[in-house]
Amino acid sequence: DVYKRQAAGAALAAKLKGSDAVAVAFFGDGGSNEGAVFEAMNLAAVWNLPCLFVAENNGYAEATAANWSVACDHIADRAAGFGMPGVTVDGFDFFAVHEAAGAAIERARAGEGPSLIEVKLTRYYGHFEGDAQTYRDPDEVKHYRETRDCLKQFRERTCHAGLLSASDLDAIDAEVEARIEDAVQRAKNDPKPEPDDLLRDVYVSYP
């Protein structure tokens, strides 16, 4: 919960320094109901801070459906109560998210304050290890996988628009997979932490 407030703090620091940095806080539909979000949004709005709040609404907070915990049609509707713009976008559409985020960042850098973006999407897997998602209709996930795969849609649209070729995208995929594999191998080869490391940096220490 703290990082939502930290985003407002980072935005305040950027404003005081005269930086063009914009702080971004990500949280889910469940997290959007927490007081920390309201506190951060209110402070960012009152102090006109360059902060972007992104609500990733995948329809479930652990096993609780969003319509059981959110009374309004869209989480973005709450932005009006804080005096900031709010917009709901299709989270499966890379270009829609890019456009909305770009507009919000441009607005923040122009000194016009924070924004709230609600990104509507789904999650393919459970909330935690061993979550069988018995609270969902299995066909729901199947439907999204077959019809709303954002990576597949991005590939099709960029190729159709001539922005990138299939070979360009294949090369990007290969590069990313190689970087991931390299990171995994480096992590496996690193020495294991010492028992004393468990308590390192937990408490403040003075010279």
Residue ranges with predicted function:
Residues A178-P207:
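Short, amphipathic C-terminal "tail helix"
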Residues D1-N189:
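Glycine-rich ThDP/TPP pyrophosphate-binding loop and its adjacent helix/strand module
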